[in-house]
């Protein structure tokens, strides 16, 4: 059992040394070579905990501000593995992603130093940011190729796979491939149903947007309830899929928010209605 465990207040760190005080009120500063240290455990700062509570409560704007403050406060030790400056910076980027602020994400990533991240899922998330950046730049063919490679890997969490499918859906939509886009957006639901509330909501609205604007759907809406209605047509199938999504929005996907007005009319095309 180790006997040389020390509880200290770390002030700064470099690639070779750590500067610390024995207590927060101590005047004397000491220095120790990192080569002599086996491992470091950080206590969670109160400010980080408060920001995380906002994050879990889906107040991403408030959480982003909180994480930014933690990142700045502890940046003198961001060389150390597992430090809270690096971790706060990661969640600051995540807040920008959940707010769909892709330009803000790009700016934060440009200055981010991820080397001290220790959690494998966080490291994997960094790889997915390349897909989000392709969305930002509307690099659709590259994004299709990128997500092909990503989806072939097994390392992703459900939330991460949902992101990959969502970005892929946007790429297919950008390439005017509506059915492929719908399949990809449906993958978002399958990968992480309602847990990634921002993505599932956005994917649902994307599906409704695509279906409503599809020429086959427009024809099915025109023929609905007439003798020329064709329940076996692609348009009729898409129309009923949209109706089901509208119902699902009210039950779970909407998170308590009303269905946008432009999609309310779809509900009148419910079969047997």
Which residues does each PLM region occupy?
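Primarily a tetratricopeptide repeat
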Residues: 65-66, 107, 145, 180-183, ...
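Alpha-helical linker/edge segments of TPR/alpha-solenoid repeat scaffolds
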Residues: 43-46, 91-106, 131-143, 170-180, ...
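Flexible, glycine-rich surface segments
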Residues: 132, 141-200, 206
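Short solvent-exposed coil/turn linkers within tandem alpha-helical repeat scaffolds
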Residues: 23-30, 72-85, 111-126, 149-162, ...
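Compositionally biased alpha-helical segments
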Residues: 1-110, 114-117, 125-137, 141, ...
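Proline-rich intrinsically disordered, low-complexity coils
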Residues: 2, 114, 141, 178-181, ...
């Amino acid at each position: 059992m180790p006997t040389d465990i020390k509880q200290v207040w770390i002030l700064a760190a470099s690639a070779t040394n750590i500067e610390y005080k024995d207590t927060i009120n101590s005047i004397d500063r000491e220095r120790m070579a990192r080569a002599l240290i086996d491992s470091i455990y950080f206590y969670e700062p109160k400010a980080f905990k408060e920001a995380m509570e906002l994050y879990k409560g889906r107040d991403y704007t408030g959480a982003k501000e909180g994480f930014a403050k933690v990142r700045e406060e502890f940046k003198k030790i961001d060389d150390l593995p597992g430090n809270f400056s690096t971790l706060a910076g990661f969640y600051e980027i995540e807040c920008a992603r959940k707010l769909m602020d892709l330009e803000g994400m790009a700016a934060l990533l440009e200055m981010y130093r991820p080397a001290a991240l220790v959690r494998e899922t966080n490291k994997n998330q960094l790889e997915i940011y390349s897909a989000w950046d392709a969305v930002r730049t509307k690099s659709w063919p590259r994004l299709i190729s990128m997500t092909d490679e990503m989806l072939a890997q097994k390392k992703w969490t459900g939330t991460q796979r949902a992101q990959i499918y969502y970005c892929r859906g946007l790429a297919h939509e950008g390439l005017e491939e509506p059915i492929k886009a719908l399949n990809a957006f449906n993958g978002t639901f399958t990968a992480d149903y309602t847990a990634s509330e921002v993505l599932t909501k956005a994917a649902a609205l994307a599906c409704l947007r695509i279906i409503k604007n599809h020429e086959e759907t427009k024809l099915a809406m025109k023929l609905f309830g007439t003798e020329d209605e064709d329940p076996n047509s692609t348009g009729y199938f898409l129309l009923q899929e949209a109706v089901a999504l509208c119902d699902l929005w009210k039950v779970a996907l909407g998170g308590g928010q009303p269905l946008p007005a432009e999609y309310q009319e779809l509900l009148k095309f419910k079969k047997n209605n």
